[in-house]
Structures are given as C-alpha cells and as structure tokens.
Curated annotation (Swiss-Prot):
Gene3D superfamilies: Lipopolysaccharide (LPS) transport protein A like domain. This is LPS-assembly protein LptD. Belongs to the LptD family. Keywords: Cell outer membrane, Membrane, Signal.
Length: 778
C-alpha cells in the first residue's frame, strides 16, 4: 500500500527538455535491470542435480575435487561462475564449493559478483565476499564486504542499497548490517546512513524499507511547504503495517506560526467491514489572526467512514466528519473535506435489503461553515421502508414508500417535529418498438406532530398537521431515426419526450417555521437546482415538507448524431421547457409561486468532434426573472491520460443564487473563467498549471503551478499556489476585501521500482477547485 516514499525538503530546479524517449519510463528503467535467463525451475532446489563444467579437473574421490578454467556450477535456478573452484564432500549430505578469485553468482532473485565465495551444494546457502549484487527482474542493487545468502534471507555486512540503476548514485542507504527478507519483500538495516549524491543527510540507528510490493512499517520521507499564512511547515509521516488487513499512518506536522499538529489515519478491512478512522489535532493554535470567541484555540478534525455487509441482506454505512470550528477547512488542507463543500456531514444508515423490499434506520446532521442565525435540522431517527410488487395489479407496478422521522434544531426558536409519511405509487408502463408510455398515480400522505420552540420568541405552531396530496403523471418517450443524413457520414436520431403532471394545491406554510428559510423550507426541503434532465422531475423541492402544486406539461427532446462507420455518438443537443397550466405554489406567498406560464428554458449539449477533443455546454434562461440564470461551457483537449488542456466558463446570476441559497453575501453574479493544463512533457518531466478568475469581481480565485521530475528511483515535485482564504477575524469583509494564502512546497518521493507515474493525475487533484470532467460523451 505504501511503497512510495514522499517528500524530502530540498531546493531543486526542474530542467525541462522536449525530446521524447523511445520507450516509456518503466521500460527504460527495466532495461537496466537483469532478468533471469532460461526457464525458471520450481520445486526443492537442493534435490536438483548438480552440473559442473570446467576446462580442467583434478578429482580426489570421494573427498574433494578441484576445477580450474571457466568453471560453471549449476543447480536448479542458481549458477556459479569462477576461475577456480574446490568441491569438498563429507558423506552424502554435505557438499561445499569454495571459489577463489573473481566469481559470478546468479539465481532467479539476485545476481552478484566479487572475489572469494563459498556455496553449500546441499542447501540453498552461499557465503560471498567483497560482493556487488543486483536484484533480478526489479530495481535494487548494492554492495557488501561479506554476505550470507539462503532461500529466504540475505545477511549483508557493511552493506549499501539503492533502487537506482547502475551508474546512478542519486541516493543510497548504507549500514553496518543489512538483512533482506525475500518472502516478505523488505530489508532491515542497522546504523543506517541515508546519502544523496554520496553526501550523508540522515542517520537512524535502525531503518526498514521495501524491496518489493509489500507494505512495511517505518518512517516515510518528510515533506515541507511554506505558506504566507502558516509560515514554514514540516511533516514527518510514520507508516505502521499493523496486520495484512489493517495499517495506519501517523503524521506530526510543525507549523512555525501555529504549532504542532498530529494527524493519525487508521485503515482496516475486517469481517465487520472496511473503513477509515482519521483525525487532525492542534492543542493550541498560535496564529495571531485566529481569535475564537470562546478563546478556545484547540483545532481538530474527526473522520470515520465505514461500509459493512453482514448476515444476509444487512448493510451498515457510516460517514462522519466533524471539525472544531467553521474556519477549519479554510485554514487547513485536508483529505476529508473542503471549504467549498459548505458543510461537513455526519450520518449513518443501517439497512436490511431483500429483492422486493428494504428497511433502514438512519440519522443525519450537517455542520455548516456559513454564519447562520438558524442552521439546518438534524434527523434522528429516520426509518424508511420500500416495497415493490409487479404482480399486485395486472399490468401494473406497485411501489410503497413509508418514512418516520424525528427533527430537532440547535436553535431554541425552532420547533421540533415527528413526521410520518406514506407514499403508494402505481405505474402502468406500455412499450413497443415505437416508444414508451407510462401512466403513474401516486399519493403523498403526511402527518406532523410539531412542538413549539422553547424560546419565548418562538413562533406558535399547529401541533397536528395532516397533508394529503394525490398526483397523476403521464410520460411519453420515443426514438425517431432520420432516413436521410443531415451531415454526411453521420446518422441522426431525435428523442422527443412529453410529460404531464397534476397535483392539487395545498397550503404548507404551517409545516415548520419560516425562520430557517435561508437553508431550507420546513424541516428538510429546499428548491432544487434545475437543468435539462431535472425538468422531468416530479417535484421542484427536495425532501417531503414542500410538495408544490402542479398542473404542467414538460416538453423536450434530444438530438443525437452517430458516426455511421463506428456507431459511436459524436454529438448531442437537448432542449426542454415546462409549461404551467396553472401556477405552481407551496403557500400564498408570491415569491414561492410560479407567476409565468413557462419555466426556464434548459439546454445541454456535448460534442466529441475528435477522439482527443470534447466540448460541453449548458444554458438556462429564466422566464420569471427574464434573464440568463445559469450557463457553463468547457472545452478539453486530451490526447492521453497524462496530457490534457481544459478551458471552462461558469455563470450564475445573483437573482438565481438568491432564489436558491437566500444567503448570497455579496449580492453578486458569479462569472468565473478557468484554465487547467496537465501535461507529461517527457517520460521524466510533467507539469500542471491552473488559474481561475472571477470576472465579476475582477480578481483571481485560485492559481497553481506544479512541476514533477521523475527518474527510475526518485521523483521531485515543486509547486506554488495562491488561493482565496477566509477573512481574518476582525478584518474588513466586503466585496473588495479578499484575502489570499500564498504557498510554496517541495516534495521528494523515493521509488523502489513499483511506481513510474508521471504525477499528472495526482497534481490535478490538488487545489480548492480540483479538475473534473463533465462530458456526456466519452
């Protein structure tokens, strides 16, 4: 799992070169590695016959024999070549060969040469002197004053080891004694000196490192970075291989402006499931600008993710993340969350699943990072039941969904509630070669038991609320294929779709309180974001607390073009709109009602005009706001997995944001352009650069430049980054007051012949806005 060792702090200059090598890096590295010649023999090696060839032989039976001149001794997979060999025999079991002068030893795992050696022909043991060795079929070589080799262990005295190829001494490890464990694929070394270009840079009385693919405990290579906010940072990870099915990484980090942070991560795979438990902790954050209201300077993160299948049909899922404060992900880079998420999720779900029904109990809570007077509700417990039966009614498919949920809020102004919901659905699907027609009837039956908030300022509530809403839906789809080609070489299809939905109006303003409408309606409902595909959703709101009235027709269609020779889709274009025969509303407030007869126009398109090129575009025009509400487009050139260029643009109007989020702090449109380049220049040099700029604010959002230099036995990464960060406490917080964190880092990675990655994909994952692909045609 951890065969790569990351990041020594060094200053380096990346030297770019543009010529391309004849073979990729892995092939180049393996060209410098010896390979076993001939057919590998399996079985007990000491039972194999011994073959001795020489120019001359003096035999003194049955005690000894002396061979001279191009002597070759072969037994199974091992061979010895020397100028002079004396073989001594003591009975049938003990036979030893003594080599004088220069020799060469090889088997299917190692090659060695030197002066003077002894070999036990009755076992798999060899004693070598003044030897140089190289692993067979993988990177790894070294020297030793003396060594004892057997079938599962090599003991070397005054030895060196490196994974670099011959004539490359970029790094090496020296020690008084080294034991290489062959089956376990690791080496132990005592009084270890780590050298770079022959210069000692690190000492340890004891060290372990891999000589294969298996995981081993030990210190990983430290990493460095410097940030304008954190100052100088140094991390020293320690890897602990606890058992074959569990391991851990413990990383202490020192920030010159904050203090010490400890970050343990435990991974497991057991009969009780698989998952990860992690944490990050600073006992006292010394950063001057961090001034919490309660003067508590402890900063921490807790994370637990667990998946489990047990007995027959039972599943358990846990995803729990909690941080000490709202600024945590703005101040610290973490694998377990981001400031752009807006919240941390704490949830679990235990379910029992059968072919025609399932039952689950769950709980969920959100820790928001925005400054909100009233936060979202937590739900515990939530009990869900689903039942499916396609034989209950002839020609129909019956579904039943039922839920019981308890809602509570941290604010004393907010009510508490139990919600009981039943939702039977009956579908009558019809399909033939011309298309499909689906008739659906559904009933939403919900009852609430509400308790007024404990504060005197809390709104009065109806204690018992019952809401029953029937629904009818008709959905028609077909696929039409054009007889003639609009564009030569491309076949065309058109997929029209028409859907009618009817639900009567029910005033739902007495469900929940209006004080938390900045995050939700009722207890867990929010206005859904819309695109072409969401036009055909039954509902405008998520959750169950707001089910808007509906008397509407949604019409749309998708046009597709296919290459007539390969049948591969190269272009599609979708357009649709909803037409309201009567206003859709959830209460009597005008802002929660559709006043126009038609909804937003929604368009979406994808074009793969070359196997290396992709384009995606989406556009929405809001007829209620009489403006473009959302738009985005992206163009990507990707000739290979490690070479890509992507340009993007995103737009969201402030009115659309206010309508959905209701907490648009700056009251500003979002107009953001972005460019990302990830490119493997050669087998050794790769880089990634990205820049995102907000046109509306006329200021950058994030910029990154990262360069990777790769060799057979090490790689180095140098990066610089500048990104928006949280407003320092007490500082001005207006649209013109933006704050940035500037970061510089150098990473080293020792390679032991198991990884030849260019590093492009790893670099693309970094940043506040990571690289994504959103293309509908691959």
């Amino acid at each position: 799992m951890k065969t790569r060792y990351s990041v020594l702090s060094v200053a380096m200059t990346a030297a770019f070169y543009t010529q391309y090598a004849q073979a990729d890096l892995r092939e180049q590295c393996l060209l410098g590695v010896p390979h076993f010649q001939g057919e590998e023999v399996t079985g007990d090696q000491i039972m194999m016959p011994i073959e001795i060839e020489a120019d001359n032989a003096v035999i003194n039976q049955p005690k000894d024999a002396t061979y001279t001149g191009d002597v070759a001794i072969k037994q199974g997979n091992r061979s010895l070549f020397a100028d002079e060999v004396r073989v001594e025999q003591n009975g049938e079991q003990e036979r030893r060969a003594f080599l004088k002068g220069s020799y060469r030893y090889q088997d299917n795992l190692i090659q060695a040469h030197g002066r003077d050696a002894a070999m036990d022909l009755g076992s798999e043991t060899a004693e070598l002197q003044n030897t140089e060795f190289q692993l067979v079929g993988r990177q790894g070589r070294g020297t030793a004053e003396s060594g004892s080799f057997n079938h599962n262990k090599r003991i070397l005295k005054n030895a060196t080891f490196t994974a670099c190829l011959p004539n490359d001494n970029a790094w090496s490890i020296e020690g008084n004694e080294m034991i290489q464990h062959i089956d376990e694929e690791y080496a132990e070394i005592w009084h270890a000196r780590f050298k770079v270009l022959g210069m000692p840079v690190f000492y340890s009385p004891y060290l372990q490192f891999p000589i294969g693919d298996r995981r081993r405990s030990g210190l990983l290579i430290p990493n460095f970075h410097r940030s304008s906010k954190d100052g100088f940072a140094y991390s020293q990870p320690f890897y602990w291989n606890i058992a074959p099915n569990m391991d851990a990484t413990i990383t202490p980090t020192y920030y010159s402006r904050r203090g010490w942070q400890i970050s343990p991560e435990y991974r497991y795979l057991t009969k009780l499931g698989e998952g990860i438990v992690a944490g990050e902790y600073i006992g006292k954050d010394r950063l001057d600008e961090y001034r919490p209201d309660d003067n508590n300077r402890k900063r921490y993160l807790m994370h637990w993710r667990h998946n489990m299948s047990f007995l027959t049909g039972w599943r358990l899922y846990v995803d729990y993340t909690k941080v000490s404060d709202k600024r945590y992900f703005s101040d610290f880079d973490s694998e377990y969350g981001s400031s752009t998420d807006g919240y941390a999720t704490q949830q679990f779900k235990l379910g029992y699943y059968q072919p025609n029904y399932n039952l689950s109990i769950s709980g969920k809570k959100f820790q928001t990072f925005d400054e909100l007077d009233v936060g979202p509700y937590r739900v515990l417990p939530q009990i869900d039941f689903n039942y499916y039966n396609d034989e209950l009614v002839k020609g129909g498919d019956f579904k039943l969904f039922a839920q019981t949920a308890r809602f509570e809020n941290d604010s004393k102004l907010m009510p508490k509630a139990w919600r009981f919901h039943v939702e039977p659905t009956l579908n009558f699907p019809l399909a033939n070669r011309y298309g499909s027609l689906n008739f659906e009837t559904k009933l939403y039956a919900t009852h609430y038991l509400q308790e007024k908030g404990s504060s005197k300022q809390a709104d009065d509530m109806d204690k018992n609320v019952t809401r029953i809403i029937p629904q009818v839906k008709v959905d028609l789809q077909t696929v039409l294929e054009a007889d003639k080609q609009l564009f030569k070489g491309f076949n065309q299809t058109f997929e029209p779709r028409v859907q009618y939905v009817y639900r009567p109006y029910k005033d739902q303003s007495n469900i929940g309180s209006g004080l938390n409408q900045s995050v939700s309606f009722g207890y867990d409902s929010a206005l859904l974001q819309s695109d072409y595909f969401s036009l055909f959703n039954d509902r405008r709101y998520s959750g169950l607390d707001r089910i808007s009235s509906a008397n509407l027709i949604t019409a749309g269609g998708t046009n597709r073009f296919f290459n007539e020779k390969t049948g591969v889709e190269v272009f599609n274009f979708s357009i649709g709109q909803t037409y309201y025969l009567s206003p859709s509303k959830i209460d009597d407030l005008s802002q929660n009602s559709t006043t126009k007869r038609s909804s937003s126009w929604a368009l979406e398109s994808n074009w793969k005009f070359h196997r290396k090129w992709n384009w995606h575009g989406a556009y929405q025009y809001d007829t209620r706001l009489n403006q473009t509400s959302l738009a985005n487009t992206s163009l990507q050139y990707k000739p290979s997995q490690d070479k890509l260029v992507q340009l993007s643009y995103r737009f969201a109007s402030k009115d659309y944001i206010n309508q959905n989020l209701r907490s648009n702090t700056y009251g500003q449109d979002i107009k953001q352009v972005g460019a990302v380049v990830g490119w493997e220049l050669t087998d050794r040099v790769a880089f990634m650069a990205s820049h995102y700029h907000d046109i509306a604010l006329k200021k950058p959002v994030e910029s990154q430049l990262s360069v990777n230099y790769n060799t057979c036995c090490w790689s180095a990464n140098v990066y610089v980054a500048r990104k928006l960060t949280a407003t320092p406490i007490g500082s001005p917080d207006t649209i013109n007051d933006l704050y940035y964190d500037n970061k510089f880092g150098v990473n080293f990675e020792l390679r032991f012949g198991t990884n030849y990655s260019s590093g492009v994909r790893k670099m693309l994952k970094k940043g506040m806005i990571p690289y994504t692909e959103q293309y509908g045609i691959n």
